[in-house]
């Protein structure tokens, strides 16, 4: 998670000359080297994962906390857990693809001289993650759900603002995913393969999140240092707020409901997204992210 008292950096030269950032990067790079694993030899993929058991913790399902959850039979619960797990890993595949594109565009470019060495660890690990999530989906479900997320308007064509929004989006994505990884890795009701991929992903993402928190703060300080006006700040808040919303909504996939045998998936999605219990669940998933963005001044309590 992000440090509770992330200190401000020297905005204009934050990514090029920041002693604390350099120390963090060295520590994270050393840890990445020490924790390195070959994903192609690490996993002992079983031929199948039984369909008459849970693939995802019931507490993480999109129906949890609603009266609809209580109406599910054991078989329906198992089916929903299977297809919502496939949706979750599919979202990882699509999200990782996008972040790899954005980070690769910036490695060894002006302004990112200092973090570029860590970017190589980051890119390699994320490529591994995309491979094992895709392998899980294809091997045990026969498909990856297509990316149906709502595309946000283009970010403002200002390099500093674009850089900030890119890494803020990456941080949001990683923290949402990590919320699930931690619980799935610890849930003894789940198949060992499910727990294993989530444990390894969390192990790597803990470094990526520590890096992302510091970089996002430094890029935000850069924007403030150059004199970000209130209109631009309002636009940034709105953009990130919409990204938080669309990220959460992507966890509610009508195709997963259909595959689980639940009727009228689009109506079910609308009903669930409006349900008070699900609103509370969303706040729980996002609390680290919104807390961090509030703490550094991107969000405020009145956004």
Model-derived features: positions:
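Soluble, non-transmembrane catalytic domains of enzymes that act on hydrophobic metabolites at membranes
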Residues: 211-227
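Terminal targeting/low-complexity segments that flank the catalytic cores of oxidoreductases
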Residues: 1-116, 139-150, 160, 164, ...
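Active-site-proximal, substrate-binding regions of enzyme catalytic domains
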Residues: 119
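Active-site-proximal alpha-helical scaffolds that flank and shape metal-associated catalytic sites
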Residues: 135-204, 230-245
